[in-house]
Amino acid sequence: MSEEAKKRIQLALALAVVVAGVRAGYILYQRHEEYLAAQKLEQAKRAGYSNPDYYVQPKKLYPYDLKSARQLTQQPVWVKEGYRYTYYAYDPARKRTDFAHEAGLLLPIERLEIKDVVTAFPPGADQRRQLMAVFQKEGKSYAVPIGFEPVGEFKIYSDEMFYVEDPHDLYKHWPADIWQAIEQHQVKPGMNEMQADFAVGMGVPDAGRSDEKTVRYPNGGKPLVVTYQGGKAIEIKAGS
């Protein structure tokens, strides 16, 4: 066997060891996260929390590379925080994301069908490679960042962005009038913060007292200010 062939075999074996190590690390991480979720649920039960939301454990995919991130194509996803994530026009023929022009923001609890997960480099020599989820909207293709590659290893945050189970099923214990307000993108007195997030997207809390909380919602250009007391909305007014 030639020296070149030996080097190729050694390189292939080394690569296989690295891949196996990454996979093993991912499995351990996934099991650790599942263990923490189970512990959190058990603690909630022991504390006797009456809020059923504490017992909801949304499924996570724990993606760690391009291949595992493509699990997003296997089921619909729903946006967790509306008006937070910017998406861009995507050319599927050229596999190119138009980072120069923002196409919009993902909406609250918007349902998406992820068609593919690809990589892309934004303009600029110092920009890091981005991981993009490709979807269609009104017949056009778009891509939204779901992670990046700082130094040879992806940091993927799609589990923080999307539900992979229908929120209507996860939170089926919510009353029908709450879901109706959410679908109409309205915040009503008595809603909790999660329900308000579902209705009008991400909010930014003010610093203040622990027993009373004020949260400001950009709401896609129609700002709202909501005051919560005891975890429930007591005042809703237009923001500025």
Please place each PLM-identified region on the residue numbering.
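Short, Lys/Arg-rich N-terminal segment immediately upstream of the first membrane anchor
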Residues: 1-7
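Hydrophobic membrane-insertion alpha-helices, especially the h-region
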Residues: 10-27
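Hydrophobic single-pass membrane-insertion segments
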Residues: 24-36
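A cross-family detector of function-defining hotspots
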Residues: 28-31, 120, 126-128, 172-240
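SH3-family beta-barrel domains
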Residues: 37-97, 161
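Basic/aromatic-rich interaction segments and small domains that mediate binding to polyanionic partners
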Residues: 47-49, 121-141
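Conserved beta-strand/loop element in small beta-rich adapter and peptidoglycan-binding domains
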Residues: 97-123
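Boundary regions of SH3-family modules and the immediately adjacent low-complexity/disordered segments
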Residues: 133-171
